[in-house]
């Protein structure tokens, strides 16, 4: 007679792909890197002003670097959209807003980095927008990403 429960007998799939899915395709890490780079670029704009920031730090090259984790976070954010656990409806709304923000930023940054090759487009956004992102939006997004939990991945995911 066997007395072991199904939980103990359960063999977890330890493949690389399974680990990748179980960790939400590493969306959290990509999103935090993306927002972290955004903090650096917006902080440069606020501290140095548009003229200095655009000449030295906010460049097409830095925008292309930002675009890599941003695109990855946008794609994986959409993939894990239904697998994220939320404690409150507010948490769900903030997570969805963060994915929409990141995914919506990709076309703008593709345009800046590969089509117009002109980062001066960022001056279209008033300086208060950078302050809003730095003081309110980015801290909320980073906190949300830090607390992110996923539902167990199923074979159909």
Language model: regions and residue ranges:
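Cytosolic juxtamembrane helix and N-cap/initiation of the first transmembrane helix
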Residues: 1-39
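Short amphipathic alpha-helical segments that mediate assembly, nucleic-acid/protein binding
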Residues: 4, 13, 28, 67, ...
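Membrane-interface helix-boundary signature
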Residues: 17-27, 58, 62, 84-94, ...
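Alpha-helical membrane-associated segments of multi-pass integral membrane proteins
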Residues: 24-32, 38, 42-45, 71, ...
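Interfacial non-cytosolic loop connecting adjacent transmembrane helices
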Residues: 48-63, 106-133
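Loop-to-transmembrane helix junctions at the membrane interface
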Residues: 75-111
């Amino acid at each position: 007679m066997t007395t072991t429960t199904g939980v103990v007998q359960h063999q977890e799939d330890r493949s690389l792909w399974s680990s990748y899915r179980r960790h939400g395709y590493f969306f959290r890490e990509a999103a935090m890197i993306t927002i972290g780079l955004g903090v650096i670029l917006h902080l440069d704009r606020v501290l140095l002003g548009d003229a200095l920031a655009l000449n030295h730090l906010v460049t097409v090259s830095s925008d292309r670097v930002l675009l890599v984790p941003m695109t990855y976070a946008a794609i994986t954010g959409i993939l894990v959209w239904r697998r994220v656990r939320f404690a409150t409806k507010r948490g769900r709304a903030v997570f969805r807003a963060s994915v929409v923000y990141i995914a919506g930023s990709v076309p703008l940054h593709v345009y800046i980095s590969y089509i117009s090759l002109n980062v001066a487009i960022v001056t279209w956004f008033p300086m208060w927008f950078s302050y809003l992102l730095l003081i309110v939006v980015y801290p909320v997004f980073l906190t949300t990403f830090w607390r992110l939990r996923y539902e167990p991945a199923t074979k159909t995911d």
